[in-house]
From Swiss-Prot:
Keywords: ATP-binding, Ligase, Nucleotide-binding, Protein biosynthesis
Any one annotated GO CC term: cytoplasm
Biological source species: Saccharolobus islandicus (strain L.S.2.15 / Lassen #1)
Function noted in UniProt: Allows the formation of correctly charged Gln-tRNA(Gln) through the transamidation of misacylated Glu-tRNA(Gln) in organisms which lack glutaminyl-tRNA synthetase. The reaction takes place in the presence of glutamine and ATP through an activated gamma-phospho-Glu-tRNA(Gln). The GatDE system is specific for glutamate and does not act on aspartate.
Annotated protein name in UniProt: Glutamyl-tRNA(Gln) amidotransferase subunit E
Family: Belongs to the GatB/GatE family. GatE subfamily.
SUBUNIT field: Heterodimer of GatD and GatE.
């Protein structure tokens, strides 16, 4: 993928970091924040959008309501109560969660509000039994100084219910996660490159982890991105859980938006307008035409009682297949996303990708004839039941018309390859209204003093402290930049001074680089693995010198467990080590007498190759020197 000039493109990126807080209980009740599946009961709900204070309906809420889905909630015994079921009013806001959020606000030099007001944010995708999410702004403003990125808001809010299963007409959730406190940190649209977006997310994540009061693991932190380019509009991208995906998501989204604007230009060049699209919009039932088709998808749809519709796309030849992201997404993919989300239908084909999928040239010509399509026109084929097809036709028409606006306002979901898909329209200002069941909480001096206990240390202070621990300035800088900085702190607190902080820092940084350079798959190494190694050094099970070899063997062999590799490299008993040294010396006596004092390096090299990290180099050297001294006398 060719790199765009992001400055010329006018790229602007803002981040929203959502991190679960590790508090003793949930945000608005006393239930545990641990995830447990000990449910015995379920409840069912249908949710409807409510009017805002101004009598308006949020478009995103309306979109979800139109799906008509039933929501089923599992009720865990130990991690939910009547508050989660929306059968009891919420309790007072969790003070511990407030203190953690205030600590982060202090660290980011934000302006803390005088009073906290809880608001209701309308959400009717079923992830909240109430039909809204409770959220409260704690601070405004602030700055991530070394990146020049402003902080807009810091808020506490309740996490959503955990999705268990989704079908066409029903979604099942567990209430164990609903109500776990989250901190939300929103930056200004000040980020100007994909790489900076990742750095900012990393630094905010590190700041949160350094409080020691956030949860860790998959699903405990989520990044949302707001991305725009010159001439376009802000697009929200939800649910980025992997930090390393952020640069690709920004690159791909910038490219997608750039090409959508190019399509808008091309439509104008062709003299096409919305009115011309509508007046030449032809839809035909082509089921009979495809009754003997070799296309498996169309054939299967017809056999299930479905129909095949053909839609003329006036003067859109080449537009439907226009690559928004090379080899990943075309304009036709965007239309298909809308159809999946709004009409719940797959099985869409367009003329720019045919003949293919078993559809022949002869069938293409018959479709063109039936739709009265010229060589300048494109067409779309879709298969399904009549009711959904009629809805799909409306969706396809509306998405083609949106192409004349360039970039439609959307909320999109992040995918594992760094691309995104359409989820729903963007929510409007009609989404928020005050929570009437919870009184305001004034921020007093005592709350602020308690919060200061959780304020994380500044990078400058860390640098000085790490150097006093024995780290070089270069290693200290490297560990401060590393995503596993909080792991380093944790391991130093647990295992030093017996295990040197230098060894711990080097393992996390330099050793992993070495393993990767030797072909090891370092994605296999998690934080628990690193702690297991450091703990083994602490317990004298292995030598610190064996860490790199253990990790290399572990990451270059698919079917091995770390514990088995550690067992293989367990430290040699002193007697066995002495015997190896004596055997090497006795086998090289002539060379030793010839080299004299320089023989140490020869013997050291031969012993190390036999020991393979199962003993400390320092210990081996001392034993060799004492034995060579006896030989030379």
């Amino acid at each position: 993928m060719s790199e765009l000039n992001y400055e010329e493109l006018g790229l602007k990126v803002g981040l929203e970091i959502h991190q679960q807080l590790n508090t003793s209980h949930k945000l608005f009740c006393n239930c545990s924040t641990n995830l447990k599946e000990d449910y015995k009961l379920t409840l069912e709900r249908y949710l409807r959008p409510a009017l805002s204070e101004l009598g308006e309906v949020d478009v995103a809420a309306l979109f979800e309501w139109k799906k008509g889905k039933k929501y089923v909630y599992r009720i865990p015994i130990t991690t939910s109560c009547l508050v989660e079921a929306d059968e009891e009013p919420p309790h007072a806001i969790n003070e511990e969660a407030l203190k953690i959020a205030l600590a982060i606000a202090i660290a980011l030099n934000s302006n803390i509000v005088d009073e906290i007001y809880v608001m209701r944010k309308i959400v009717i995708d079923g992830s909240n039994t109430t039909g809204f999410q409770r959220t409260a702004i704690v601070a405004l403003g602030g700055m991530l100084k070394d990146e020049g990125v402003t902080i807009q808001t810091i808020a506490v809010e309740e996490d959503a219910a955990r999705k268990i299963d989704e079908r066409t007409d029903q979604v099942t959730y567990s209430l164990d996660r609903l109500g776990i406190p989250l901190i939300e940190i929103s930056t200004g649209p000040d980020i100007r490159s994909p790489e900076q977006a990742e750095r900012v997310a990393l630094k905010i994540g590190q700041l949160l982890r350094m409080t020691g009061k956030v949860k860790r693991g998959i699903g405990t932190i989520r990044q949302d991105l707001n991305i725009s380019i010159k001439g376009g509009t802000k697009i929200e991208i939800k649910g980025v859980q992997k930090l390393e995906l952020i640069p690709d998501i920004v690159r791909y989204e910038a490219m997608r938006q750039f090409n959508l604007l190019k399509i808008k230009e091309e439509l104008n060049k062709r003299g096409v307008s919305k009115n011309l699209i509508l007046s030449n919009f032809v839809v035909k039932d082509l089921t009979e035409l495809f009754k003997n088709t070799n296309s498996k998808i169309i054939k299967s749809g017809i056999e299930k009682g479905g129909l095949v519709y053909g839609i003329r796309a006036y003067k859109l030849k080449g537009i439907l297949g226009w690559e928004l992201i090379p080899k990943k997404r075309r304009f036709g993919t965007e239309i298909a996303d809308y159809v999946r989300a709004l009409a719940e239908l797959g099985g869409l084909f367009h003329s720019d990708e045919l003949p293919n999928y078993g559809i022949t040239e002869e069938e293409i010509n018959k479709v063109r004839e039936a739709l009265n399509a010229t060589t300048e026109d494109g067409f779309i084929l879709i298969v399904g039941e009549r009711e959904r097809l009629d809805k799909a036709v409306e969706v396809i028409r509306d998405r083609i018309l949106l192409a004349f606006d360039g970039i439609p306002k959307e909320t999109r979901g992040a995918l594992d390859d760094g691309t995104t898909k359409f989820l729903r329209p963007q929510p409007s200002s009609a989404r928020m209204y005050p929570e009437t069941d919870i009184p305001p909480r004034r921020i007093d001096e005592k709350l602020l003093e308690d919060a200061k206990k959780f304020v994380p240390e500044s990078p400058e202070s860390k640098m000085k402290r790490y150097i006093t621990l024995g780290l070089s300035e270069e290693l200290a800088k490297e560990i401060i930049r590393d995503p596993r900085l909080d792991l380093f702190e944790e391991l130093v607190n647990k295992y030093s001074p017996k295990v040197s902080p230098v060894v711990i820092a080097s393992t996390i940084t330099n050793t992993l680089k070495y393993v990767k350079s030797k072909g090891g798959d370092i994605s296999k190494i998690n934080e628990e693995d690193i702690e297991e190694l450091i703990k083994s050094v602490y317990e004298n099970k292995i030598s610190k010198d064996s860490i790199s070899e253990i990790l290399l063997e572990y990451t270059t062999n698919k079917n091995v467990e770390l514990k088995d590799v550690i067992r293989k490299y367990e430290a040699l008993p002193t007697e066995e080590l002495e015997k190896i040294i004596d055997d090497v010396i006795s086998s090289n006596l002539d060379e030793i007498r010839k080299r004299k004092d320089k023989a140490v390096n020869l013997i050291m090299s031969k012993v190390m190759s036999k020991v393979k990290g199962r003993a400390e180099g320092k210990v081996i050297l001392e034993l060799i020197k004492s034995r060579l001294k006896n030989v030379m006398e």
